[in-house]
Amino acid sequence: VTDILGREVSVPQDAKRVICMYASTAHIMALLDKGERIVGASDGVTRDQMMVTKYPAVADLPTPYHEGAVNAEEVLALDPDLLLIKEEMYLKDNERQKLDDLGIPYVVVDYYDLDGLRKAIQVMGEVFGEEEKAQQYLSYMDEQFTYVEERVKDVPEADRPRVYHSITESTKTDIVDSLCAQIIHAAGLIDVSADSGLTDVGKNAMVTLEQIYNWDPDAIICNEYAVTDYILAQQKWSGLKAVQNKSVYTLPIGATRWCHHGSIEPQMAVLFLAKTFYPDRFEDLDLRETVLTYYADYFGMQLDDDTITKILSGKGMRESSPSLEME
């Protein structure tokens, strides 16, 4: 297969023991119905309730790398026949050398935007011989984007809500052309950080509270409910109009955090944001029904009402990281 960096990699025809050193690769494996083959994964995966429900063994998976550094002994102990890694790891000379020395095939799967996500899902489809399943999912993704974009395209710029997106930490936010900025734009919204030209080397950037006051967004959307609660409770955030108007929302969490740079479900975030900010234009969109059908069709899971409520509230589907820092 050819990975996202254009490397030609010979992979086992039917890889049975896979280590996912990038959380999103584990989520894509679940999408392709191959999650039972994961023998090691990033610790975030073990906190994802949907992964654990579908594949109970995930809860106890070891993480054979720490802070981006591969532990060769731990990798070998898991006897993997394939490693899935993120670009950042490959670009570190010492880590790449370690991977090469292991002699286990590794595929780089990573993304920064929608096109990158499409490519990542296609590459994973090829790795596991599930090209058709990957393509069906991508078609669904594109259909949802088009559905929303068509309905909001005539909203004048001046009438589009300006939103600030808090990614895991209150002052970590979107950069230009990132996956989350694309999600927010598709939903007919203005992303105050990305649209002000904010850039950084990674997938997001840290800003100051002063900067957020300068933007004074109409609404704030948060990836963690703990951050939503924090922003609403903190005196220093209370001068923002979004806080005064209680326009601070927690984003849903399903198989992945829908509006996160590691999301494999950006179309679901677009639907949620469209329904939240343009209820009149999306009166016929039943999010609960959509969620029910979507997880049945693409993840083979029959969700009960309680789980759908948790997904849409962003509460109870993922254990917060203990390192959740607040500004």
Where are these regions (language model features)?
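Short, low-complexity disordered leader/linker segments with a strong preference
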Residues: V1-Q13, E327
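Short helix-initiation/N-cap motifs at beta->coil->alpha
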Residues: I4-G6, L61-E73, G197-L209
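Extracytoplasmic substrate-binding proteins
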Residues: E8, D93-K172, V201-N204, T250-E325
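Structural recognition of the beta-strand scaffold that forms the well-ordered cores
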Residues: I19-Y22, V39-S42, L82-K86, P105-D110, ...
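A short, structured surface patch at a secondary-structure boundary
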Residues: C20-L78, L82-M89, L189-V192
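Solvent-exposed loop/turn segments at secondary-structure junctions
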Residues: S24-H27, G44-R47, L82-L83, E88-L91, ...
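A contiguous binding-surface segment within folded domains or other stable secondary-structure elements
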Residues: L78, A194-T250
